[in-house]
């Protein structure tokens, strides 16, 4: 036997399998979800925003007049999806058909004051919503979050407004949205929030006591060894059984 060495995972970024139960992942730096740089031009309308999670939800807008636009270099060097504050919104297919727990994170900013409605919705669902920063004033990038242990629906998600109301239109830029089908543990929540804050320039909005206020979190994406119960040589992790 040789010297035992520590294994350090090469990939420490958030991925679709990093935190269990990720059911919707929208990223404005990868609108088509293919993992490569987007070829969209500044100001082009966004008819669909591809879900990067394993669930592969459909998030789109079929009506040309209600589509947000793609904006380059609005979160520093990163692109964003801009909603006009009048009637832009996107709709998702049902993430889950039964009630249960959830955890949602949404990154947004408003560069110009007076755009959209006060109390505008970043995300609207029956029974709950995620609201943009209070009022219609400008605000720097920040991570909005919301969660529940149970009783929440994820069947009729709208991004950017509530279509049943004319006073909830969001005017500003969205960078990233993550929805999990359970309430995350505190450590998980802080890691996801820290990742988003550092990625989108929102660390200034984190409280001073946040564990990732100064340094971005590192995720462990290394392969996990799982014994197969009942399989000869594998029900106990041994040298011969691996």
Positions of predicted regions on the chain:
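Carbohydrate-binding surfaces in secreted/extracellular proteins
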Residues: 136-148
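Extracellular glycan-recognition modules
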Residues: 44-139, 167, 182-191
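Extracellular fibronectin type III
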Residues: 1-6
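GGW-centered surface loops in extracellular recognition modules
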Residues: 8-60, 105-107, 176, 184-242
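Short Gly/Ser/Thr-biased coil->beta-strand turn/linker motifs
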Residues: 23-24, 79-81, 119-121, 157, ...
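Extracellular glycan-interaction patches encoded by glycine-rich segments
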Residues: 151-175, 183-184
